[in-house]
Amino acid sequence: MIERYTRPEIGAVWTDEARMEAWRQVEVAACEEMDGPTPQDLEAIRAATFTVEAVKEREKVTDHDMAAFVDVLSASAGPGGRWIHYGLTSSDVLDTALALQIKRAGEIIRPGTRACPAG
């Protein structure tokens, strides 16, 4: 995105931080629907954190953005982190997270389209 042509609130949807936060939301939601994690595991998974810097540093080792993210998030969750990404593919997470980002962008843009004249 070219910053000078981007509304700040739209640009914020597409940052690395926002993208990885969407990944985190997908991973947490998937864990919440599994039968395996204990309530303690889920509590730790929900509380798990990441930083973009930590993920990028780990990516230097993994050569894979999602693998790096999963490693960082899982480590943050402790033993319960073993359930993060369990049964998922990278595409499962990436595609679903992208849909969340598109939805957020639409929620920002939509009110402005109502002000446009028809036709």
Language-model features and meaning:
Residues M1-G119:
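A helix-coil-helix interface module used to build multimeric assemblies
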